[in-house]
Amino acid sequence: GPRAGRPWLCVTGTNGKTTTVGMLGEILRAGGADAAEVGNIGTPITRAIDSAAEVFAVELSSFQLHTAHSVSPLASICLNVDADHLDWHGSAEAYAADKARVYQNTVRACVYPASDRRVEAMVENADVVEGARAIGLALGAPLVSQLGIVEGLLVDRAFVEDRAHHALALAHVSDLSAVYGPHPSAAALSDALAA
């Protein structure tokens, strides 16, 4: 596994992994962290362990999750589960079970799309480190312990101090326009919230 103290932020899902991991790496570096994107993009996981990075944004495929046993991510997310790769996994249930492994042993935050009951169930059934929280992503106004969108702002009601009464503006939807054009898709907004 990784050297002690270097957090892994793990991302899986049928669609959006590469985009989300790329954004996550940019956010971490903008915040001053020496971050590396690893997995299917960037550096292979096996080589990343030897790098000097302080934190890893890790893209994990269902194939990698099927064989991964020793990862304890600081935070993890399954963006979505669509029925692809069934030829390899054998069934939609087996595929979803492999994707669900991203949440195993998560230390701080199990992030999931609030509108996706299948992924929410993965979080509920995961064997996590005591104290890990479930954090939902909403494309509208977020409930407590969610991130969401209010009046064109991506907002946090999960990690702010008084989350029952306050939300923290993280970014403006227009911040995504350089990459996604003036009207980012729901998928782009969801990936940005995930990152």
Set out the residue ranges of the language-model regions:
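Phosphate-binding loop of NTP-binding sites
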Residues: G1-R133, Q146-F159
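Adenine nucleotide phosphate-binding catalytic loops in nucleotide-utilizing enzymes
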Residues: H89-E93, G131-A195
